Amino acid sequence: MKRLISIALVLCMAVSMTVFAANTEIFINGEKAGIAEGMGAIVEKQGRTFVPVRFLLEHFKFQVSWQEKEQMVFGMGPEGEIFVMQVGSELLFYKDAQNNEKKVTMDVTPFLNMSEDRTYIPIRFIAEAMGYDVGWDGATETVTLTKK
């Protein structure tokens, strides 16, 4: 009986391990953009490359704030840009410096990693909303973001 329970636990753990740290590298406008130690990691989940929201927004010089009660991330860019997203929602809102608004519906849901206290979002959706072309090289596991 103990053996059966042990096997069942191992199988449950194996099935639930769908999130893992990736060896993926990110280049933004030709420069490597690494996530600082203690600031999260690049994560592969549901066939998408997720990054901590704070990492990417701060790379673009945004001031980032977290609203715990609503579980929302707010970003204010250096030229008045606005970024808003909520954990558990597939909707992302972005307003650029010219006041053009974009509401993007993602095909996967951003998630909160409680152990790291980090909110993760698919890099493609946030980058495209902010006017970047997104490239993927599967052979080198490299994401490239290039400003349009």
Label the predicted regions.
Residues 2-6, 12-148:
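Primary recognition of N-terminal secretory signal peptides and signal-anchoring hydrophobic helices
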